[in-house]
A protein has these predicted regions:
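Internal catalytic domains of large membrane-associated glycosyltransferases
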Residues: 1-190
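Membrane-embedded multi-pass helical conduit in multi-pass membrane proteins
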Residues: 193-196
Length: 196
């Protein structure tokens, strides 16, 4: 579908996302960030389904912390933010000629979006993150839905450990960036398993 898009930039959105008119006016400022080697610009999400109960409020709070504090730290000083899904904006011309925005496979790539970001870093690109703009997103409001999402993310991290792309990526990192990458991905789930 990337080849049918027009313009120089491409925004990836899910079906459960919404963009607001006021935020659309900020998009011009965001697109000015594509200078030099910047290939992905990410920004935060506002969970509009947080009023659906205690589980929905917990999921929205979890997403808020990941979308603001964690991604800000992953961008700088840790330098390990990749493409974590939506609503990132891509340099469309770059991703058309360098492998696309993700790598979908039914068996291996459960969390397919991170491989697009790893491809950017492997090819010398830069990932930025801005907080002055946000996009609306609806989350599951049932316990089973939230639990299923967490299982999908944890399973995707397990499959990432086995991937050839992330093996290549970690070979090009220094020691401190490698520790940051480990603790922001599979190390998070391993440390939680050890602590419980």
């Amino acid at each position: 579908a990337v080849i049918f898009a027009r313009g120089e930039c491409l925004q990836t959105l899910d079906m459960n996302q919404d963009n607001y008119m006021g935020e659309a006016f900020k998009m011009r400022n965001l697109l000015e960030g594509f200078v030099g080697e910047v290939r992905i610009i990410g920004f935060r999400e506002h969970i509009f389904s947080e009023q659906g109960g205690a589980v929905a409020n917990f999921a929205a709070s979890n997403e808020f912390v990941f979308g603001t504090i964690v991604q800000r730290w992953m961008t700088w000083p840790l330098c390990v933010r990749f493409h974590y899904g939506h609503p990132d904006v891509w340099d469309r011309l770059w991703c058309m000629s360098n492998g696309g925005v993700s790598r979908a496979s039914r068996t291996l790539h459960v969390s397919e979006d991170i491989f697009g970001g790893a491809n950017v870093i492997l090819r010398g690109g830069v990932v930025e993150y801005y907080e002055y703009i946000h996009c609306g997103k609806g989350r599951d409001i049932t316990f089973a839905g939230v639990n299923g999402f967490e299982q999908k993310i944890a399973g995707g991290n397990a499959y990432q450990i086995m991937s050839r792309d992330l093996h290549r990526l970690t070979r090009s990192m220094d020691f401190f960036r490698l520790l940051s990458f480990f603790s922001s991905g599979s190390g998070f789930y391993l440390s939680n398993a050890v602590m419980t």
